[in-house]
Amino acid sequence: MNRRQFISSSGAAAAALSSGSTTQTASAAPAKRALMKLGTETQLGDARLKSLARYGLKNVGGAPPRAEGSVWPALDDLKRGREAAEKNGISYDIVTPPILASSQIDRERHPAIMLAESPERDRDIEQLQTLVKNCAAAGIPAFKYNMSILGVLRLPARVPGRGDATYSAWNFKEAHPATPLTKAGRVTADRFWERITYFLERMVPVAEEYKIRMACHPQDPGVPPEGYQGVDRVLGTVDGLKKFLSIKESPYHGLNFCQGTVSEMLQDPGKEILDVIRYFGSRKKIFNVHFRNIRGHRDNFVEVYPDEGDVNFVKAIQVYKEVDYSGMLMPDHVPQAPDDPGGQQSFAFCFGYIRALIQAVDQMG
């Protein structure tokens, strides 16, 4: 075969392969894309937003700057927060209100909803209803909140991690159940559910009217059925979360799904968490994700870097893709180090790790 014949036959073969490939591609179903986004909770100052854009973030949640002396963000505050984010190529997707935080009730500035104190709780609920209306007017689709009395429970001493990092930990056997009651006193499961129901009955219809998603964080961590410090932790189990969502069924009533916290509810999180993600995700009840890993299990765990915990994050992100989850994956409770007291290096590590996972799972088809 001379050179001209070789080139001619090679070209014909290439054309045939190309034609076959085109036919095969045309007949194949389009690849399933990963819809989730890298995100974080943040302040909305320009310098901070610029630094987040540097790491490839395009979506955030947080509290907007407020006028001095004001407790609640006004509509203009929300618009300024959204505009500040957009100026840096970032979407402001979820608002953090000034009440119903994860702090312990004795430190909470506005505890009336969780203490069932009237008329103060009705006033606070009205303020949240106004926030929902303002979110709709400002073009921000969701807000997140906690229904917690004890706040986030951890042991005072941190645990050595890799390098010079330290990790937060919880071990119920090493905690102090005899710790005095909070100002809430004894709160049985029935009383806790009454307070939750009172809140949801007044908030969910407004959220539906204005099409704003309400994303509730589970109680962190779950504790035994007898509770802790006199408080039954009703949102500290998977069954509790299911009951919570059933109280007022709505596409706008769902979860700020802290994967770390839910893992803390389980005896074998590495095996169990995937089906939990699948359960809530397939029902479109996951509005935001705190993408955090642990080593351990219910009542005894350590919060670690995302790549070294008991939950396989590759498998986890595949399930989020499977259920078409389209919200944010946020780092949360990152390790600390002596030269990184604010955790910025740890957050940067998590941003890169999560971004790479999203890109990888997107290519898997």
Locations of regions flagged by a protein language model:
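Residue-level marker of alpha-helix boundaries and capping positions
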Residues: G39, W72, D122, W193-E194, ...
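Active-site-proximal loop/turn and secondary-structure-junction residues that shape catalytic pockets
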Residues: T42-D46, R66, T96-A101, M147-G151, ...
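Catalytic domains of carbohydrate-active enzymes, especially glycoside hydrolases
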Residues: L44-A63
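Structural motif corresponding to the early beta-alpha repeats
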Residues: A63-T197, E201, E208-E209
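Surface-exposed cleft-lining segments at the edges of enzyme active sites
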Residues: P180-R195, P221-D232, E303
